[in-house]
Amino acid sequence: MSLAFIFAIAAECFALMLAGGGFYEVLVVDPVWPKRPELIQADRGGISRKRFWIPVHTAFELSVISALVAAWPAPAVRGWLWVALISHAVARVWSFVDFIPKALAFERADPRSITEASARKWTHRSVFRLPLELVSCGATIAAFARLARM
């Protein structure tokens, strides 16, 4: 079993965690928290999203970059890993520029000061990041499949 194969397995596992976490937020957390902002405020007993997202994003990024380096001699694999990394990078840049600052503001604000309309607007826009992570997930599956046939 090659190093590229091991890193591709790791990248796929973390990509699936990212997709699962994204679906969980979209389907379970986001429909509820706009009416109850304290649900996303760890200081008030709510969930701490950063305890999941920071380690999983970091692990995915390190594993996909490692897989890319290890699979560099295999152009078919390398191409899929580039797709995974670039789509993930687009989602991360978008998150850093727009979503994370607003999420942190919601998490720090007095729950009474958060309007349901502003929270719903954020959750509706947040849904559009999920397809980018699904592209990363699909691309890592494709890279893994190519490596498995080598």
Where are these regions (language model features)?
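Core segments of transmembrane alpha-helices
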Residues: 54-68, 129-138
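Mid-bilayer segments of alpha-helical transmembrane spans in multi-pass integral membrane proteins
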Residues: 89-97
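Interfacial loop at the N-terminal end of multi-pass membrane proteins
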Residues: 3-64, 100, 104-120
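Membrane-proximal soluble regions of multi-pass membrane proteins
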Residues: 116-124, 129-132
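Juxtamembrane boundary at the C-terminal end of a transmembrane helix
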Residues: 142-150
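Interfacial segments of alpha-helical transmembrane regions
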Residues: 2-16, 69-90
